[in-house]
Amino acid sequence: DEVQARLQEAVARLPEVQRTVFNLKYFEEMKYSEISQILNTSEGALKASYHLAVKKITEYLHSFD
């Protein structure tokens, strides 16, 4: 549907690291500890990337209101 299409568009617009973290956390429902091992990145950095990704996606989706 339209909301799903906009979500996918918003995710595609993210920087690569944020997109990867968001996809693994949101869609794959992985834990930060698992993502940390895969990407060889600290959990703190992953949480920051995820938070920024959610913020950018939210702003993008609200731009259609």
How should each PLM-predicted stretch be described?
Residues 1-20, 30, 34-37:
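Amphipathic alpha-helical segment used for protein-protein interaction
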Residues 12, 26, 58:
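Short, locally clustered residues in the helix-turn-helix/winged-helix DNA-binding domain
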